């Protein structure tokens, strides 16, 4: 039996990549598309909806969400309430929102995933960085994205910092008396480590994690040159969440 999929935000670049991936996989069936701004009523025989409420009662298994931080929480909550397993690539959730959604998924006995990054290489980078942080306490993160990205720092950078902070003693980096001649020059402060965000046209999604110690340095980097790099992870997530009974944060929990 094929897995029936809804894509929210299908007109965006990630949504278009997800549309292509789902329609090319014989194990998946696209049953609904959501975008509040389109005038289209259907695409290749698949119905298009302008409001999530119009999807209530639709027979579907998985809700794929590539929308905006402004609506992602409400969308994910709606999906769970309707019995859809959410696979969410939109970032910007607060810790409180994540906890609420995880609790709701347990009540509904539905699997789900919220992931800051679906590229397998990026997931590995986060894991490798957490391993290195046990031995290199001084670290800074540089994330680079296209200039249309709405949030900063990226969800991937925040997730990386969270994983590092779990194994690294809290430490304020840099000189104790350092001063910024321009506010923000040292980047965002996360538990003493610094996160820097770059936004430029031509970029897709890139991240460096730079460690420093006496007499040596270690740099880890991942690059997504095309949004197709995320689709292996999205495909894996769609097929895995239907087997689960709880929402998780981070693709690594499904690998």
Swiss-Prot record:
It catalyses: (S)-2,3,4,5-tetrahydrodipicolinate + NAD(+) + H2O = (2S,4S)-4-hydroxy-2,3,4,5-tetrahydrodipicolinate + NADH + H(+); (S)-2,3,4,5-tetrahydrodipicolinate + NADP(+) + H2O = (2S,4S)-4-hydroxy-2,3,4,5-tetrahydrodipicolinate + NADPH + H(+). One of its GO terms (molecular function) is NAD binding. The active site is at 145 (proton donor/acceptor), 149 (proton donor). Signal peptide: none annotated. One of its GO terms (cellular component) is cytosol. Catalyzes the conversion of 4-hydroxy-tetrahydrodipicolinate (HTPA) to tetrahydrodipicolinate. PANTHER family: 4-HYDROXY-TETRAHYDRODIPICOLINATE REDUCTASE 1, CHLOROPLASTIC-RELATED (PTHR20836:SF0), DIHYDRODIPICOLINATE REDUCTASE (PTHR20836). This is 4-hydroxy-tetrahydrodipicolinate reductase. It comes from Streptococcus sanguinis (strain SK36). The lineage of its organism: Bacteria, Bacillati, Bacillota, Bacilli, Lactobacillales. The gene is dapB.
């Amino acid at each position: 039996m094929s897995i029936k999929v809804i894509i929210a935000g299908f007109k965006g670049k990630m949504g278009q990549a997800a549309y292509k991936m789902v329609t090319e996989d014989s194990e998946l069936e696209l049953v609904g598309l959501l975008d509040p701004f389109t005038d289209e009523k259907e695409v290749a025989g698949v119905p298009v909806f302008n409001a999530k409420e119009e999807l209530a009662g639709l027979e579907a298994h998985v809700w794929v969400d590539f929308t905006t931080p402004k609506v992602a929480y409400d969308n994910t909550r709606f999906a769970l309430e309707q019995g859809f397993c959410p696979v969410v690539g939109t970032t910007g959730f607060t810790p409180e929102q994540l906890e609420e959604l995880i609790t709701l998924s347990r009540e509904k006995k539905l699997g789900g995933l919220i992931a800051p990054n679906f590229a397998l290489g990026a997931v590995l980078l986060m894991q490798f960085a957490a391993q290195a942080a046990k031995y290199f306490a001084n670290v800074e993160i540089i994330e680079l994205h296209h200039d249309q990205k709405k949030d900063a720092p990226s969800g991937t950078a925040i997730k990386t910092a969270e994983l590092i902070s779990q194994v690294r003693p809290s430490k304020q980096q840099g000189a104790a008396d350092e001063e910024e001649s321009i506010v923000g020059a040292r980047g965002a402060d996360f538990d003493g480590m610094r996160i820097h965000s770059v936004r430029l046209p031509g970029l897709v999604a890139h991240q460096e994690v730079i460690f420093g110690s006496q007499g040596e340095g270690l740099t880890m980097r991942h690059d997504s040159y095309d949004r197709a790099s995320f689709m292996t992870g999205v495909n894996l997530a769609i097929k895995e969440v239907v087997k689960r009974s709880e929402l998780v944060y981070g693709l690594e929990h499904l690998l």
